[in-house]
Amino acid sequence: MSCYDLCRPCGPTPLANSCNEPCVRQCQDSRVIIEPSPVVVTLPGPILSSFPQNTAVGSTTSAAVGSILSAEGVPISSGGFSLSGLGGRYSGRRCLPC
């Protein structure tokens, strides 16, 4: 679409159909409603890990089968994990020797 009809006259009648002045025409605004499409987000499932504590550490006797294990001769009950019989040499912060 030409906007020459919207330009001011360029002075005397031109010899050619031209104009040296800029011509800008602004049309009405358009409204568009953009609805977001559904987005599928996959969240990773939980990772379950298990670290059993059924080992005898520093046993001076053969491995016991049953509810009592020993570490350096001091019984360790199978109901939990305890290092209290090791005399404080091993804290929960250091790895125990193999």
Swiss-Prot record:
Residues bearing the modification N-acetylserine: 2
Coiled coil: none
InterPro entries according to UniProt: Keratin
Stretches that traverse the bilayer: none
Keywords attached to this entry: Acetylation, Keratin
GO cellular component: intermediate filament
Pfam families for this protein: Keratin
Molecular-function GO terms, alphabetical: structural constituent of cytoskeleton
Family indicated by similarity: Belongs to the avian keratin family.
PANTHER family assigned to the protein according to its UniProt record, in alphabetical order: BETA-KERATIN-RELATED PROTEIN-RELATED (PTHR31203:SF1)
Subunit text: The avian keratins (F-ker, S-ker, C-ker and B-ker) are a complex mixture of very similar polypeptides.
The name this protein goes by in its record: Feather beta keratin
Organism, as annotated: Mycteria americana
Source species taxonomy: Eukaryota, Metazoa, Chordata, Craniata, Vertebrata
